[in-house]
Amino acid sequence: MSKKILYGKEARKALLQGVDAIANTVKVTLGPKGRNVILEKAYDSPAIVNDGVSIAKEIELKNPYQNMGAKLVYEVASKTNDKAGDGTTTATVLAQSMIHRGFDAIDAGANPVLVKEGIELAALTVAKKLLAKSKKVDAQEDIQNVAAVSSGSQEIGKIIAQAMQKVGKDGVINVDESKGFETELEVVEGLQYDKGYASPYFVSDRESMTVQLENALVLVTDHKISTVQEIVPILEEVVKASRPLLIVAEAVENEVLGVLVANKLRGTFNVVVTNAPGFGDNQKEMLQDIAVLTKANFVSKELNMKLADLKMDDLGNINKAIIKKDNTTLISNSKSPELEKRIQVLKTQIKNATSDYETKNLQERLAKLSGGVALIKVGAATDTELKDKKLRIEDALNATKAAITEGIVVGGGKALVEVYQELKDTLVSDNKEVQQGIDVVVQSLLVPTYQIAYNAGFSGKDVVKQQLLQPLNFGFNAKEGKYVCLLKEGIIDPTKVTRQAVLNAASISALMITTEAAVVSLKENKDNNFDLGTQE
């Protein structure tokens, strides 16, 4: 296939137009008064969203050079979402500013490699400064404030704080859809284990890359399933029952996986396979925990039980199974006396444990079994409102977990302003071009504050000037339009979210400024005279 190549300034200009197309769309959502973006859906009603990564994911530009620039910024948002669960809009705004400043330096004659060195140095320094400023999250009020700031709703903040109080900071919290208008919290029996689907072809929801099974049968075994023939008899019974099946096994051969996937895709039966969590003896115990929760008979090698002899009575039941790439959550709505007995056995084993390793494993299993699963059931008047609310709650939940991991810093962009003040005169290099790279990052730290103020209807420049005059932890409350003690007002951000936003924005910016050529494929019978002056 033929290629078309752009060089130097022309290539950078095209990439920058793509960067601006995506960043200008995403940044309108930043802050407590950020606006929404409406997204066309091919086979569904339009979605109205406030989530940076969800917006960025949907943007495809006709011009391939611009599209490359847009996709690189989407990667910033996506990486930030993967690592911190929130902060995607902040990361996008920072990336746009850094790329603009970096390209300006290169176009003025600076050496891209040295500028890149300065960007990387500054980003790492900013990340360290943020960690040094971080305040540990202990109080219930802090958890509520983080969730409220992320979601833009005090009600959501309260619900997430209550959920964490009930199942613990490390407990399992899932977001589900309610049939009513109200958003409610419910705690049910369940557990989560650290293994996801054995093949991505089991996924039913491509957008979230998850699969959910309702009222499912459960097969729990420490056997390695080597041939399809071993499980054909029980699969035939499952097909007759017309119910989905979750298989939790030590391992499943690729040939067997292929057959199961093919049958699922054909609609013969609904099945998902996950490998067993843990290793060795601990794996057997965890499988027995799953069997007790689901009321399944644990099909054990040690007891010489064979997969070919399985009957329907050997399978367990679960109200809902949510299977993701790296974990599986099992939810049961019924109380089980066997589960209570299992919990008591674990408590006794903890008392009698002879090593720290054994105690730790037993405590982890006990926490998983006894903590239950908190379900946040999202209610709304319309499907469009429901989707938006669900996204906000998921972001807020991720932000709260990030805050528990690394702590919190002052919000409203003030933490980055304070780091700017600390570094603008102290982070210096003898090399002029490395210094230009440092300035690319340090000067960009003021941009989130500017954008938050602008979206709230204030002069971004004036607010930034005032922010620089405020004492430590004091800053602009964009919702109320006044300067306050941000910590007292509960305007806080998770350190991990802010830190990852800076690191990921700097990473892509450092790579983009070293670009001297852009190559795209020419499609046959298409008009390839792209207009670089427009964004399509």
Curated annotation (Swiss-Prot):
Catalytic activity field: ATP + H2O + a folded polypeptide = ADP + phosphate + an unfolded polypeptide
Enzyme class: isomerase
A GO molecular-function annotation: ATP-dependent protein folding chaperone
Keywords: ATP-binding, Chaperone, Cytoplasm, Isomerase, Nucleotide-binding
Keyword Acyltransferase in record: no
GO cellular component terms, semicolon-separated: cytoplasm
E.C. designation(s): 5.6.1.7
SUPFAM superfamilies, per the entry: GroEL apical domain-like, GroEL equatorial domain-like, GroEL-intermediate domain like
Subcellular location: Cytoplasm
Chain positions recorded as ATP binding sites: T29, L30, G31, P32, D86, G87, T88, T89, T90, G412, D493
Pfam families: Cpn60_TCP1
Any one Gene Ontology BP term: protein refolding
Assembly and binders: Forms a cylinder of 14 subunits composed of two heptameric rings stacked back-to-back. Interacts with the co-chaperonin GroES.
Main function: Together with its co-chaperonin GroES, plays an essential role in assisting protein folding. The GroEL-GroES system forms a nano-cage that allows encapsulation of the non-native substrate proteins and provides a physical environment optimized to promote and accelerate protein folding.
Homology family: Belongs to the chaperonin (HSP60) family.
PANTHER family: 60 KDA HEAT SHOCK PROTEIN, MITOCHONDRIAL
Protein name from the UniProt record: Chaperonin GroEL
Species assigned in the record: Onion yellows phytoplasma (strain OY-M)
Lineage: Bacteria, Bacillati, Mycoplasmatota, Mollicutes, Acholeplasmatales
